[in-house]
């Protein structure tokens, strides 16, 4: 048996209210690149399911930029580390790494000959640096600012010029190499932070945008101010991003006023204005004019493709998670995938396009801990002390069914739902609690097989109950585990029960007897166990970032290992078909794996 990666549903850009989001593209016009968590995401602009993730930063990433050749990416993080790595090989071989700043790197710019970089952000001694890419040696000084530098760019044509925008309201102009400060070209122009500066592709113009809603165009050779984009048509909120068209005549801007605009940089007039919703998450924090695709990123991290034919509605919105994905479920009848993340967001995925839709109505208010699918019902429970039974066809949340403490897991059989909180086991029918059983051993997980209900506890035991009508009656316990039970799952054939624990062990039970022994290949807590549709294999997911597939018919056989599946740990794993596995991880990604026997 072998397991190969098929597709990645990548996390969306990480966002912070009031701060720009950096999204950049490759020279070929195929892939975009952005930061999310401690990863860098490479994603095909036409097909979101085609993606790659760079995991090598030791902390939260902030920005990534392709070299003009397209052969390398330079990426930065909050600790001031700059990593330059190969894009042509799957392994992304590291070319160089430098400690450039003492604080977060916020923007990066390459010279068109691929030899030099300007790196800016926060720091104690300096807010920017100009370096040679292959040695890290200085090729100038980025000076003249008294506060954090938020943005930088380099003119693509010789003689090179560099520009920087800062929290001190200045746009500084540098000539070189070696780059040296010449002047503040925006003296008196901005009254708040300068969030983004960008040279036109031909280098003839520079556009700058600020938190004071203003935008200016300067001469790309001299830094002389040419025009202010029409104040009468300006955004009504701070501008966080700008990007040039390929024809050098138009610029796209993104604003906290929940709109994007296209401007004619010769006349200063607004040509198009794209409006979004009224929610705070509709604030636009970054944008990219990428070939024939106009992209904008909102506060929720969603990437919208703007539609020139309908300015009120994007032609496509790439949704996703930018927090850890804790639980997933697959609807075998419809072929849809469901996922929920740490921030309580719940998405339904179309696996043919990689696009997702939200449910409407009153959502959970805290992390969703479990998802199950029963026909048209989506059963969820969450840390907000509630269970919901929602309509899949209507894509609307159901009413909250309150429980006494954070809900840990749900399971169902027919019209019966069993949910466990940290204190109690609940039996739910028709959307109402019909019975509850106190549990002093803190339930953690639940599985149901017809009238047999198994509940895992922090006391290292599996408590087995018999369901009769609306009531649970204690039957027996299974106590071979030496750690708290973390997940339970009955086999589709109904003969076996799989369990995982915090002491890294997986056990398959046949009745009261353990069928498997010594399944302890994981090096950390088991987070999930799942059965293949034919009941022959069990997949386990762990905090150790590994997935193992165990052979139930041959328990002594070595399991198949999927190494380094997700950065920071695998939170859930499920089977789609016998030849397909879905996994969800701490980095916010969902991965689809092919399994071949």
Curated annotation (Swiss-Prot):
Mutation effect (residue 167 to A)? No effect on binding to cofilin or F-actin but does not restore impaired chemotaxis or F-actin assembly in cells lacking nhe1
A GO molecular function held by the record: actin filament binding
| BP GO terms, sorted | actin filament depolymerization; actin filament organization; actin filament polymerization; asexual reproduction; chemotaxis; chemotaxis to cAMP; establishment of cell polarity; intranuclear rod assembly
Query: In UniProt terms, what is the effect of altering residue 193 to A?
Result: No effect on binding to cofilin or F-actin but does not restore impaired chemotaxis or F-actin assembly in cells lacking nhe1
Compartment(s) where it occurs, according to its Swiss-Prot or TrEMBL record:
Cell projection, Phagocytic cup; Cell projection, Lamellipodium; Cytoplasm, Cell cortex
User: Which positions does the entry assign to WD repeats?
Assistant: 56-95, 100-143, 144-186, 189-228, 234-273, 320-359, 363-397, 438-475, 480-517, 521-561, 566-596
The note filed under miscellaneous reads: Suppresses the impaired F-actin assembly and defective chemotaxis characteristic of cells lacking the sodium/hydrogen exchanger nhe1.
Please give the GO cellular component terms listed in this UniProt entry.
actomyosin; cell pole; cortical actin cytoskeleton; cortical cytoskeleton; intranuclear rod; lamellipodium; phagocytic cup
Null allele outcome, as annotated, is: Impairment of growth, macropinocytosis, phagocytosis and movement. Prolonged cytokinesis with exaggerated cortical protrusions and production of multinucleate cells.
Question: Which InterPro entries does this one have?
Answer: WD40/YVTN_repeat-like_dom_sf, WD40_repeat_CS, WD40_repeat_dom_sf, WD40_rpt
Assembly and interactions? Answer: Interacts with cofilin and F-actin.
What protein name applies here? Actin-interacting protein 1
Among PROSITE patterns, the record links this protein to: WD_REPEATS_1 (PS00678), WD_REPEATS_2 (PS50082), WD_REPEATS_REGION (PS50294)
User: Function, please?
Assistant: Implicated in both actin filament depolymerization and polymerization. May enhance chemotaxis by promoting cofilin-dependent actin assembly at cell leading edges.
**What species is this protein from?**
Dictyostelium discoideum
Keywords for this entry? Actin-binding, Cell projection, Chemotaxis, Cytoplasm, Repeat, WD repeat
Q: Which lineage?
A: Eukaryota, Amoebozoa, Evosea, Eumycetozoa, Dictyostelia
Cytoplasm listed as a keyword? yes
Q: Which gene encodes it?
A: aip1
**Which Pfam families does the record match to this protein?**
WD40
Result of changing residue 125 to A: No effect on binding to cofilin or F-actin but does not restore impaired chemotaxis or F-actin assembly in cells lacking nhe1
Give the similarity note. Belongs to the WD repeat AIP1 family.
């Amino acid at each position: 048996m072998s397991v190969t990666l098929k597709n990645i549903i990548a996390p969306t850009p990480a966002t912070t209210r009031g701060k720009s989001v950096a999204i950049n593209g490759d020279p070929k016009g195929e892939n975009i690149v952005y930061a999310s968590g401690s990863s860098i995401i490479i994603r095909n602009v036409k097909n979101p399911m085609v993606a790659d993730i760079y995991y090598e930063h030791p902390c939260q990433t902030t920005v990534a930029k392709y070299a003009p050749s397209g052969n390398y990416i330079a990426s930065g993080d909050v600790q001031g580390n700059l990593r330059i790595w190969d894009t042509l090989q799957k392994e992304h071989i590291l070319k160089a790494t430098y400690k450039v700043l003492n604080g977060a790197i916020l923007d990066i710019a390459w010279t068109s000959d691929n030899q030099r970089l300007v790196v800016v952000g926060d720091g104690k001694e300096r807010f920017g640096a100009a370096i040679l890419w292959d040695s890290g040696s200085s090729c100038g000084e980025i000076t003249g600012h008294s506060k954090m530098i938020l943005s930088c760019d380099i003119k693509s044509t010789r003689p090179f010029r560099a520009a920087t925008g800062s929290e001190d309201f200045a746009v500084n102009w540098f000539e070189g190499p070696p780059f040296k400060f010449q002047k503040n070209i925006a003296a008196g122009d901005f009254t708040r932070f300068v969030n983004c500066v960008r040279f036109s592709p031909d280098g003839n113009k520079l556009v700058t945008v600020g938190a004071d809603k203003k935008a200016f165009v300067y001469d790309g050779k001299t830094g002389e101010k040419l025009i202010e984009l029409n104040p009468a048509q300006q955004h009504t909120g701070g501008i966080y991003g700008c990007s040039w068209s390929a024809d050098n005549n138009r610029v796209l801007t993104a604003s906290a006023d929940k709109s994007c605009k296209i401007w004619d940089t010769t006349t200063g007039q607004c040509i198009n204005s794209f409006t979004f919703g009224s929610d705070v998450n509709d604030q636009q924090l970054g944008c990219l004019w990428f070939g024939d695709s106009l992209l904008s990123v909102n506060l929720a991290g969603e990437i919208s493709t703007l539609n020139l034919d309908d300015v009120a509605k994007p032609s496509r919105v790439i949704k996703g998670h930018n927090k850890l994905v804790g639980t997933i479920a697959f609807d075998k009848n419809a072929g849809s995938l469901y996922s929920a993340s740490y921030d309580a967001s719940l998405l339904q995925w179309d696996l043919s396009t990689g696009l997702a839709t939200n449910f409407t109505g009153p959502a959970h208010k805290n992390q969703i801990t479990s998802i199950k699918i029963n026909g048209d019902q989506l059963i969820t429970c969450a840390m907000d002390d509630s269970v919901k039974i929602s309509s899949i066809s209507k894509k609307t949340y159901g009413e909250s069914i309150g429980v006494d403490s954070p809900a840990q897991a749900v399971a169902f059989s027919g019209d019966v739902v069993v949910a466990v909180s940290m204190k109690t086991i609940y039996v739910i029918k028709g959307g109402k609690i019909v019975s509850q059983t106190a549990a002093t051993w803190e339930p953690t997980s639940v599985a149901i097989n017809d009238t047999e209900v198994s509940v895992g506890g922090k006391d290292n035991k599996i408590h087995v109950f018999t369901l009769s009508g609306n009531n649970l009656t204690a039957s027996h316990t299974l106590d071979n585990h030496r750690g708290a039970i973390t997940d339970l799952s009955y086999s589709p054939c109904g003969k076996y029960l799989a369990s995982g624990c915090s002491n890294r062990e997986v056990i398959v039970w046949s009745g009261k007897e353990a069928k498997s022994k010594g399944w302890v290949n994981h090096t950390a807590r088991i987070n999930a166990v799942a059965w293949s549709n034919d009941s022959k294999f069990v997949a386990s997911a762990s905090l150790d970032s590994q997935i193992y597939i165990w052979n139930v018919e041959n328990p002594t056989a070595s399991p198949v290992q999927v190494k380094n599946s997700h950065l920071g740990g695998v939170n859930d794993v499920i089977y789609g078909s016998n030849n397909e596995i879905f996994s969800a991880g701490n980095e916010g990604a969902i991965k689809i794996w092919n399994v071949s026997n």
